Amino acid sequence: MTAILEKLTLYLAYPFVRYALIVGVLIALCSSLLGVTLVLKRFSFIGDGLSHVAFGAMAIAAVLQITNEMPLVMVITVISAVLLLRTGQNTKIKGDAAIAMISVGALAIGYLLMNIFSTSSNLSGDVCSTLFGSTSILTLSPVEVWLCVGMSVLVVAVFILFYNKIFAVTFDENFARATGTKAGLYNLLIAIVVAVIIVLAMNLVGSLLISALVIFPALSAMRIFKSFRSVTVCAAALSVACSLIGILASILAGTPVGSTIVAVQIGAFGLSWLAGTVLGVARK
């Protein structure tokens, strides 16, 4: 135990480890806040669809040889979020079909572009890193950390400022419209915020694992608590704790950061399931 603590203390002295912890906590917090809303609206796989769009956008940036791909990926993902929302409201193309269509299309086009216009000698490594997250936390630069901090503050501020409206749109959209709430506007706001979170999380967990940050904390919290506020707070706390444990475990074990975080979240979901079952029996 002493050896482990000494090893952690040694690693925490390095800036790149602190960067990973900061980014991991902020991304976990933001994704869990929106995750509860997306799960309750049965739109949780929008994160999966947009993450594949972000992969395609990164492929375009690689083809154009853009060194700082973040702005381009952000713009394309936000535009896709808006289009996805509009397409999902189409009576001929339902929400789940729209997500599947955009998700698979973006993933295929992205991989095709990376093969045709490959500028790297290690294409398989680049694709694996993009899909499953960087195997090394050394890739997080100070610029990315500050960008993540700024965007995370914006996301949390939006959620707090419009909490009541988001709550109304989440539970009964028709009633919210009847009371004068512009449900379409707040749905659009949610989609844009999710797009921002997706782009920020890609370097940490990769495009294929982002949905886990959205889904698992919300489902875990719902097993224990019933009210929207309690579920949201619990999901945020669980997500932050799992990210911290996952990052620290990946440092000690030398495993990929994203996969380790998701594995910890799966374990937390299992414990929450057991706790919910025990509480359910006790209440009876």
Label the predicted regions.
Residues N203-S259:
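Transmembrane alpha-helical segments in multi-pass inner-membrane proteins
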Residues T255-K284:
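Cytosolic-side transmembrane-helix boundaries in multi-pass membrane proteins
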